[in-house]
């Protein structure tokens, strides 16, 4: 505020406001506070740089609308003709090991488990995961990397999991592994099996699986300690098995009421 007041005093004459020649920083602060302007703070925003942002967003919302429509038509025991998946990778998950052992809670002394501040990094892994939007099942795989080869391995797993006559629709971003030459070559070996619906650039928030990743970060990964990368992979496998015993169906609501579809699943 001091520098702003000084700038105003130095230039008020040429701007036609000579009365401001004695302006002090306290007055500047009061004026800015009254109109709720805080020039000393910076808020960040993300500019839309994808010229097809709205179109791609609508394509993604159409998928979510199709899911809701299909849910209202099929019965519990019916096999849906299409599998709708939300897919993404979560790279850089650290395997962290304690250097000193955790200390148990002690009544009257320590109400919680005590953990030493120092730890050892054992390396990182990548999570490749798809959520079935119709039944909530999570298809999760832990890999050392997340290149085209790992993505193709995930596609092969999905191809083996779903019946041959089921179309697999996947919402995903345009990561290089998803559009690579290797990936395209694999897709040619399973024609009409997969359909990719890409989120717009800087539109990862449109992908439901990001909600699942956020949940993992807040819960499962928040305080986990392991003795090896292999143990971390095993813990992930146990975690996926547990959540798939009682899967949660994620639902999208934002702007979904603006999407209108005619049923293509009915017999009429």
List where the protein language model places each region:
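C-terminal domain-tail junction helix/linker
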Residues: 231-268
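Short, solvent-exposed loop/turn segments at secondary-structure junctions
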Residues: 35-38, 89-93, 133-135, 175-177, ...
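Electropositive, glycine- and tryptophan-enriched low-complexity nucleic-acid-binding patches
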Residues: 106-166
């Amino acid at each position: 505020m001091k520098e702003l007041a000084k700038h105003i005093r130095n230039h008020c004459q040429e701007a036609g406001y000579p009365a401001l020649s004695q302006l002090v920083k306290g007055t500047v602060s009061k004026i800015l506070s009254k109109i709720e302007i805080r020039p000393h703070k910076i808020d960040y925003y993300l500019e839309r740089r994808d010229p097809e942002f709205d179109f791609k967003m609508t394509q993604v919302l159409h998928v979510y609308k199709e899911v809701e429509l299909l849910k209202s038509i099929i019965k519990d025991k019916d096999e849906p003709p299409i599998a709708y998946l939300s897919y993404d990778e979560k790279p850089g998950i650290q395997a962290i090991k304690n250097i000193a052992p955790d200390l148990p809670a002690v009544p009257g002394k320590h109400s919680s488990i005590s953990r030493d501040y120092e730890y050892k990094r054992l390396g990182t892994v990548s999570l490749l995961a798809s959520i079935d939007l119709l039944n909530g099942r999570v298809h999760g795989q832990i890999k050392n990397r997340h290149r085209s080869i790992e993505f193709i391995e995930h596609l092969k797993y999905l191809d083996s999991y779903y019946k041959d006559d089921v179309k697999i629709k996947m919402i995903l971003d345009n990561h290089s592994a998803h559009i690579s030459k290797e990936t395209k070559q694999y897709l040619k070996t399973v024609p009409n099996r997969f359909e990719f619906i890409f989120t717009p650039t800087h539109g990862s928030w449109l992908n439901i699986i990001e909600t699942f990743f956020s949940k993992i970060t807040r819960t499962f990964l928040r305080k986990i300690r392991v003795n090896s990368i292999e143990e971390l992979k095993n813990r992930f496998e146990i975690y996926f098995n547990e959540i798939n015993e009682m899967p949660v169906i994620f639902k999208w609501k934002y702007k979904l009421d603006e999407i209108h579809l005619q049923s293509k699943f009915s017999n009429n």
